[in-house]
């Protein structure tokens, strides 16, 4: 668990609630409702036939029994199940712009959750590192939502790595009916050539669920300033090395690697029609989420 006291944790959760609930009510509720559809049409009632009704909806049993034409009425089955796949690996603690990825992930998760609750949808979450660390089954209600936010802030992973494939496989197996899923991560889970390691799991998951990717990153992590000889350590692998940051070729190669990773992941998401938005920790995430909702 985190080092926050119970009182500090409560204050932080409350602060996030006040900020994100207002955003959800004022900005996102309508966009969310339009962007994410229900599972289809569900039977509502039987009523007397009216001129213009589709004869394909005639209820012939009721018509025969009452000796008057009756039709079946259908309504959109609006209620969704929303699942947040939250990357809780060590890299989420990185932050040089006043906020860590952990902070921004919590706020984005809260906005999505409040938007869902406003629309009477269920919300659940599972946290992953290189394994699924915790699963919170989908439910409705403010207290459940605040439980999810508190867990995101407080949770500490038992391992250090990242395995997006494991998270996607768990989604496919644990949630049997189609859900609306949001994958929140820095998306750095790649092979040596920069290609995503999770293509097969992604392919299976999107056949069952409506998946969107929200990449949260710190731009300062993806470029190295010229500050001479420095000691760096990977928060997930634990490996460390001395690096001469005055070497222009090294800095350029480092930036090119991240650029290649981004291009390959974007290409993969386009291949499987997965909506993706990238949000920097020092950017306004409201704009990013609006873009995600409006582009659907």
Regions found by a protein language model. Name each.
Residues 1-35, 45, 173-177, 194-296:
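Von Willebrand factor type A / integrin I
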Residues 1-139, 180, 184-185, 192, ...:
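An amphipathic, basic-hydrophobic helix/alpha-beta surface used to engage anionic
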Residues 69-71, 167-170, 198-200:
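A generic local structural motif
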Residues 92, 96, 152-156, 273-276:
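Short amphipathic alpha-helical interaction patches enriched in hydrophobic/aromatic residues
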Residues 106, 160-164, 194-195, 258:
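A conditional alpha-helix N-cap/helix-loop micro-motif detector
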Residues 108, 166-170, 261:
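Well-ordered alpha-helical segments embedded in enzymatic catalytic cores
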Residues 135-151, 294-295:
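Short, electropositive alpha-helical surface patch
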Residues 144-179, 191-192, 218-219:
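Von Willebrand factor
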């Amino acid at each position: 668990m985190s080092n926050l006291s119970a009182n500090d944790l409560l204050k932080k959760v409350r602060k996030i609630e006040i900020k994100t609930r207002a955003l959800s009510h004022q900005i996102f509720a309508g966009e969310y409702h339009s962007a994410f559809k229900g599972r289809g049409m569900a039977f509502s009632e039987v009523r007397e036939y009216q001129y213009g009704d589709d004869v394909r909806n005639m209820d012939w049993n009721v018509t025969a029994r009452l000796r008057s034409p009756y039709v079946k009425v259908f309504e959109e089955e609006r209620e969704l199940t929303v699942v947040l796949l939250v990357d809780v690996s060590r890299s989420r603690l990185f932050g040089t712009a006043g906020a860590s990825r952990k902070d921004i992930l919590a706020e984005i998760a809260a906005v999505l959750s409040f938007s869902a609750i406003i629309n009477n949808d269920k919300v659940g979450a599972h946290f992953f590192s290189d394994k699924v660390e915790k699963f919170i089954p989908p439910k409705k209600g403010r207290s459940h939502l605040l439980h999810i936010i508190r867990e995101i802030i407080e949770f500490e992973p038992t391992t250090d790595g990242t395995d997006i494939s494991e998270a996607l496989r768990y989604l496919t197996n644990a949630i049997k009916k189609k859900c609306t899923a949001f994958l929140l991560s820095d998306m750095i889970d790649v092979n040596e050539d920069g290609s995503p390691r999770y293509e097969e799991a992604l392919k299976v998951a999107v056949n069952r669920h409506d998946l969107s990717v929200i990449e949260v990153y710190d731009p300062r992590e993806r470029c190295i300033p010229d500050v001479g000889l420095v000691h760096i350590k990977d928060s997930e692998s634990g490996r460390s090395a001395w690096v001469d940051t005055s070497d222009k070729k090294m800095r350029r190669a480092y930036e090119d690697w991240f650029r290649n990773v981004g291009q390959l992941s974007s290409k993969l998401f386009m291949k499987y029609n997965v909506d993706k938005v990238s949000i920097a920790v020092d950017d306004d995430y409201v704009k990013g989420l609006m873009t995600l909702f409006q582009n659907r």
